[in-house]
A protein has these predicted regions:
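A generic "binding-loop/recognition-motif" signal
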Residues: 315-317, 327, 364, 374
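Electropositive polyanion-binding surfaces
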Residues: 1-323, 330-337, 409-413, 418-440, ...
Length: 463
């Protein structure tokens, strides 16, 4: 956000030079509770400029790295222990751990994507996150108790109807959930995600839980943070790249000089909070669209190739499928070899004649048919394989659940009539992808011509 002369200059913690900073200095007990703190202006002079990889290597026992940074190895190990304490504290109080991963799309000098890799989240990354979370909470609680105008980062409780949809969806996987949608606790949601850890559908279930939550936003009123199970929260730790953080730094400085400035902040914070929330949503949407376009551009070179993939979502007009490199595409229902019944209750597609059934988390063999970098759309086709699940002899659903007709031709017509536009399948698929948010990303791309039976990576973590 700030110009590079500032972000990489006087605002950057370069080694062996003094830097003027705003610091939250906290004393934390063995249970992860802040027992004493000071928020003040300080001067920092760092010894080394390190990378996350350096710290992860040190904690993993790399002899060369430990020798290179031997002066601070004890401090790094102590920081890792503190992180573990803070993480355990958050889990015990009910913080939700959305296990999602992010992609890093590598491009050449011309901006053409050449690879898609997984953003690493080792102990070092999580350690810094723990410290930032605690600093944000401490600063927010400080100003709340002073009863001064302030900007908070809030995450309100999810709406009951959205939680009920998640409960219904989770039940389709055989999960027993205790409690009603309006009273379900964060601990129960934690238990659900722990119970499915390692399952093929864990990634999708985690995403469905995330989508059942309300969107975090900025506000002049403190409503706590549901996802973190925190009573107070703000954004304080990233003033270089986020305006609300910069505003918090200004308030710390200005309130330290005079309380009379409170009237000014009381007037401007509501508009700033609304504007910052709106801009954040626009930035996220732009990021998703660009990511989809770059993934489609990357896959243009692989049209016609076959891969093992995993069903990531099932809708009435087809199924979305994800490759091990996190690229997602659509197999439209009209491109399947027979008529398929859509079961909205358990989100399955079942072939009327063969009994071939598709479920979320199931492996599937596909061919890349089309990739459009301008729209970010990717089309796959289904290839029969040893992954196919046959469920014959099952009673078919009622007429209302039989889809959009008894053959593919009438299915197309009914689909157009219900949608009110001829290109319903592409617009629905594009809209559905936009709502999904980020998908899990894996380091290795599926290899061309991979043999049947190749497994899928796992893991998804986010807040």
């Amino acid at each position: 956000m700030l110009p590079e002369r500032l972000s990489n200059g006087i605002c950057s913690l370069n080694p062996q030079v003094d830097r003027l900073t705003q610091s939250a200095i906290m004393e934390i007990d063995k249970h992860g509770r802040v027992v004493n703190y000071t928020i003040t202006q300080t001067v920092i002079n760092t010894s080394f400029r390190m990378t996350y990889s350096d710290v992860n290597d040190i904690l993993a026992g790399d002899k060369e790295k430990r020798q290179e940074y031997q002066k601070i190895v004890p401090s790094i190990e102590l920081m890792a222990k503190l992180h573990e304490t803070l993480e355990n504290m958050r889990m015990k109080r009910g913080a939700l751990n959305f296990d999602t991963n992010e992609a890093k799309i590598l491009v050449d000098k011309q901006g053409k994507p050449v690879d898609i890799v997984l953003r690493q989240r080792g102990i070092a990354e999580r350690m810094i996150e723990s410290f930032m979370l605690m600093a944000n909470e401490t600063v927010a609680e400080h100003f709340s108790k002073l009863d001064l105008p302030f900007i908070y980062r809030i995450h309100e409780e999810p709406k009951a109807e959205k939680v009920q949809k998640f409960i219904d969806y989770a039940s389709s996987f055989g999960l027993r959930i205790y409690g009603t949608a309006s009273e379900i606790s964060q601990e129960v949601l934690q238990d659900i995600m722990r119970a499915v850890e390692g399952e093929p559908y864990a990634d999708v279930l985690s995403m469905m839980l995330l989508r059942s939550m309300q969107q975090a936003r900025y506000s002049e009123h403190n409503h706590g943070h549901y996802g973190l199970a925190a009573d107070y929260y703000t954004h304080f730790t990233s003033p270089i790249r986020r305006y609300p953080d910069l505003l918090v730094h200004r308030m710390i400085r200005d309130y330290g000089r005079s309380k009379e400035i409170a009237e000014h902040f009381e007037q401007v914070i509501p508009e700033i909070a609304t504007q910052s929330s709106n801009r954040e949503r626009r930035a996220i949407e732009a990021e998703r669209e660009v990511e989809a376009m770059k993934k489609a551009e990357y896959m243009e070179e692989y049209v016609g190739d076959e891969y093992d993939a995993v069903v990531s979502s099932i809708v009435k007009f087809g199924l979305f499928v994800e490759l091990p490199n996190t690229v997602e595409g659509l197999i439209h229902i009209t491109n399947l070899p027979e008529f398929y019944h859509f079961n909205e209750r358990d989100l399955t597609l079942r072939g009327e004649k063969s009994g071939t059934t598709f479920r979320v988390g199931q492996q599937i063999r596909i061919r890349v048919e089309r990739a459009d970098k301008m729209t970010g759309e990717i089309d796959f086709s289904y290839i029969p394989s040893e992954f196919d699940v046959i469920e014959k002899g099952l009673k078919q659903s009622s007429r209302s659940d039989r889809g959009r007709g008894s053959n593919r031709r009438s299915d197309k017509k009914e689909d157009k009539r219900k949608s009110g536009r001829s290109n319903d399948k592409r617009k629905h698929s594009q809209k559905d992808k936009k709502k999904k948010g980020k998908k899990p990303f894996y380091k290795e791309v599926a290899k061309k011509g991979a043999k049947h039976g190749k497994g899928r990576g796992k893991g998804r973590r986010t807040k």
